[in-house]
């Protein structure tokens, strides 16, 4: 896959532009599915008494996650179905060989669209072009996104292999598209013709511009020799980046100290690393050095361990500097001043200078809190100045003091009120209250899921219309990837009548959405493919017998689940007509906003009172415990939150500094000198500059590859989310207010990536907001970035 020219550079031009991350319908004939008269068939269990059905669904939602016996009974209702369906209802994926068929059918459809676009000559054909190319993107996404997910999540090696082959086939074809200059020429011809663009919808114009930008970044317009250089550089960057991420190593593998100087560290650990001559070898990677920095009383030992854990090997630094050099050359070849300029041109920030304005303003808005935190640690240390290797030690002392308090002990009971089913119930109730959509558990057909533990939820609106499908794979199992994530398996999109007719001429069982969920839009009467989402977490499984506790979540896990459901909500409500801009397919520095904002709802008292109940007694979480939770968050935030924020800001500043290097300076990059310049200028507790060798923490900063020039995005979205929380949801007072929810939905969520992010922010805050006087935020630019920096990040520390 390293041969694909765009992978290391930016998102794939023909596929997902998303964030870093992703009722059994009776089979109907295509004519029925597309017919407005059959609208009730699309979502087939609209109850006669909505409130009774709603209450029943609400209770079922809790029980399918909390009770294994209930789940087994619920999921077996459709076990008698003789004909199995395919994975996620995809009609091709009933066995491993189905992946090949799925890829081949999709490939043939792609080739037909490419032939149509290349042969276009009439005004009507050029007017179809944006929609045709969006469908081409969708066909590729259908295979690539789903295969990429299944090859990682499915337990059967045969299915993994088949999915990998389907993925590779479509990826290879995408490489062909990237070098098909005729597609670029035809699209540019269409986009420059006023008789075409005046006919296009706003969505079509946006998608055309996105694709033109992607083509330009794939070197398609360059002479053959330059294009080959571009391909070679891209391949080099891909290889270097992969090596950089996977080969991080310290300059020294261990620090040898006197065993007696490790007082404070767990004696069992000391025994493990003790040597025969009364010394001990403290490793410089893993958990032991982190524990040593928190607990060893001897400052000299902490200093040695700290410096060693932040000093990279020279090989790793060479990898990074070569990566940065080749990225600078790639940008120059593409006509940009730097890699940062190239990467940011289609983001909200637009330029490295604007990002630096934002980050510098953020340092200022955070500085007072940092000094407040450090002054308390300095008071604990006493005479000599606080050093960077002191921070973890004194923070740990403060946390220990706090954790011995009565309130902290009281909070150990909080997870009893957060069974997984209860939290899912809370999410559904919150979505219903704010946006008029809710989660309804649905039986799965044989073959529909990759593991028996996967629950399916249908998302329905207030008219009981089916609008999305979520597959929840939330329980731990051997060899499962532990990191929580949201995956878009299929994007929302309008299916044209031509596609329906095309299916009718194929095999009798062909379906315009491959058998996956569809619905008829009540306004336009057109058929739509519904977003299909997978939510993956790693929570403890409830006991098989049903006796004992269900899966109980910590407050952190609750926030994580709300975060991932924030991404899902963007996919659910951002249902555009074209898939290239649906849901989370928006600018990278806007994609985390819905998920970060959702975290704020998780522990807001008005929201907690809607769902937090004891798993055994059904008693609601008391107001006093809610207050204790809030005080606990504030206490921890005031101990280390601002310093955590500063660390994230510094990482983003380092990322910008590295990726703003022009090509003519790329031959002599000293990444360590740049790191120390940024740290000395902006850090309140910088690494010393006189240690030999100097610290080189940048060698451990793996995100420099995957998030090159965009690491600021997460904290940028945090600042915007904080502002929306404070001003639209009134710092929680309007957390369950429908008017606030509708405003946020209509100004932000429903657009997906089909509206400039600054217009979304200006729209949701409103022109009466002082930060957006006269709607000035809509213009974006340097001053808007500075303004967001002034909003700050609050005191919670880095969440998620």
Swiss-Prot record:
E.C. no: 3.4.24.59
Positions with a binding annotation for Zn(2+): 563, 567, 570
Pfam families documented for this protein: Peptidase_M3 (PF01432)
Location(s) in or outside the cell: Mitochondrion matrix
Chain segments carrying region Disordered: 27-59
Start-end of Polar residues biased regions: 27-41
Residues of the active site: 564
Cysteine disulfide partners in this protein: none
Domain of life where this protein originates: Eukaryota
Residue range covered by the transit peptide: 1-23
A GO CC term assigned to this protein in UniProt: mitochondrial matrix
BP-aspect Gene Ontology terms: peptide metabolic process; protein processing involved in protein targeting to mitochondrion
Protein name: Mitochondrial intermediate peptidase
Gene expressing this chain: oct1
């Amino acid at each position: 896959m390293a041969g694909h020219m765009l992978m290391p550079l930016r998102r794939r031009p023909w596929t997902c532009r998303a964030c870093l991350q992703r009722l059994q319908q009776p089979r109907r004939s295509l004519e029925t599915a597309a017919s407005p008269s059959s609208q009730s068939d699309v979502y087939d269990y609209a109850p006669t008494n909505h409130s009774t059905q709603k209450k029943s669904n609400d209770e079922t939602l809790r029980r399918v996650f909390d009770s294994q016996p209930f789940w087994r009974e619920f999921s077996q209702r459709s076990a008698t179905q003789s004909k199995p369906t395919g994975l996620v209802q995809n009609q091709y994926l009933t066995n491993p060989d189905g992946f090949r068929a799925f890829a081949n059918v999709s490939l043939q459809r792609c080739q037909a669209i490419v032939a149509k676009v290349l042969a276009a000559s009439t005004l009507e054909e050029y007017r179809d072009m944006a929609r045709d190319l969006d469908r081409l993107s969708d066909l590729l996404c259908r295979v690539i996104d789903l295969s990429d997910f299944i090859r990682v999540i499915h337990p059967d090696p045969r299915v993994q292999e088949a999915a990998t082959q389907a993925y590779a086939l479509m990826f290879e074809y995408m490489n062909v598209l990237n070098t098909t200059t005729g597609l670029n020429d035809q699209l540019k011809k269409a986009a420059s013709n006023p008789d075409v663009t005046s006919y296009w919808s706003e969505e079509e114009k946006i998608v055309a511009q996105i694709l033109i930008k992607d083509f330009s970044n794939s070197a398609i317009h360059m002479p053959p020799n330059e294009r080959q250089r571009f391909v070679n550089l891209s391949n080099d960057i891909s290889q270097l980046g992969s090596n950089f991420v996977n080969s991080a190593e310290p300059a020294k593998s261990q620090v040898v100290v006197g065993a007696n100087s490790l007082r404070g560290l767990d004696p069992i650990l000391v025994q493990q690393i003790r040597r025969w001559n009364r010394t001990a070898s403290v490793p410089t990677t893993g958990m032991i050095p982190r524990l040593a920095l928190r607990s060893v009383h001897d400052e000299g030992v902490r200093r040695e361990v700290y410096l060693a854990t932040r000093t990279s090997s020279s090989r790793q630094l060479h990898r990074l500097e070569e990566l940065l050099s080749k990225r600078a050359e790639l940008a120059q070849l593409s006509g940009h001043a730097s890699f940062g300029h190239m990467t940011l041109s289609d983001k909200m920030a637009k330029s490295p200078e604007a990002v630096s304005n934002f980050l510098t303003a953020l340092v200022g808005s955070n500085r007072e809190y940092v000094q407040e935190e450090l002054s308390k640690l300095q008071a604990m240390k006493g005479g000599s100045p606080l050093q960077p290797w002191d921070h973890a030690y004194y923070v740990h002392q403060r946390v220990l003091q706090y954790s011995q308090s009565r309130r902290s002990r009281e909070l150990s009971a909080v997870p009893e009120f957060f069974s997984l089913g209860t939290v899912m119930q809370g999410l559904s109730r919150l979505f219903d209250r704010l946006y008029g959509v809710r989660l309804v558990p649905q039986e799965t057909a044989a073959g529909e899921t990759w593991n028996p533990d996967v629950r399916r939820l249908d998302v329905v609106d207030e008219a009981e219309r089916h609008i999305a499908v979520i597959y929840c794979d939330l329980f731990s199992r051997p060899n499962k990837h532990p990191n929580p994530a949201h995956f878009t398996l299929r994007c929302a999109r309008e299916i044209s009548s031509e596609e329906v007719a095309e299916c009718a001429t194929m095999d009798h069982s062909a379906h315009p959405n491959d058998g996956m969920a569809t619905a008829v839009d009540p306004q336009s009467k057109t058929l739509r493919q519904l977003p299909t989402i997978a939510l993956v977490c790693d929570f403890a499984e409830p006991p098989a017998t049903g006796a004992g506790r269900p899966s109980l979540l910590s407050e952190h896990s609750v926030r994580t689940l709300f975060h991932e459901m924030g991404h899902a909500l963007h996919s659910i409500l951002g249902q555009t007509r074209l898939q290239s801009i649906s849901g989370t397919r928006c600018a990278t520095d806007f994609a985390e906003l819905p998920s970060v904002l959702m975290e704020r709802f998780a522990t807001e008292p008005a929201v907690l009172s809607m769902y937090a109940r004891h798993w055994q007694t059904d008693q609601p979480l008391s107001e006093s415990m809610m207050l204790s939770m809030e005080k606990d968050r504030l206490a921890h935030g005031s101990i280390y939150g601002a310093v955590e924020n500063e660390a994230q800001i510094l990482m983003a500043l380092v990322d910008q500094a590295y990726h703003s290097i022009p090509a003519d300076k790329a031959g002599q990059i000293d990444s360590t000198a740049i790191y120390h310049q940024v740290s000395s200028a902006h850090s309140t507790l910088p690494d010393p500059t006189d240690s030999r060798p100097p610290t080189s923490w940048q060698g451990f900063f793996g995100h420099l590859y995957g998030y090159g020039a965009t690491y600021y995005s997460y904290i940028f979205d945090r600042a915007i989310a904080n502002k929306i929380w404070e001003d639209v949801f009134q710092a929680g007072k309007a957390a369950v207010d429908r008017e606030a929810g509708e405003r946020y939905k209509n100004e932000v969520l429903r657009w997906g990536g089909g509206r400039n992010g600054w217009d979304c922010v200006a729209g949701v805050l409103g022109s009466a907001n002082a930060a957006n006087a006269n709607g000035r935020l809509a213009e974006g630019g340097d001053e808007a970035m500075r303004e967001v920096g002034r909003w700050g990040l609050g005191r919670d520390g880095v969440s998620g």
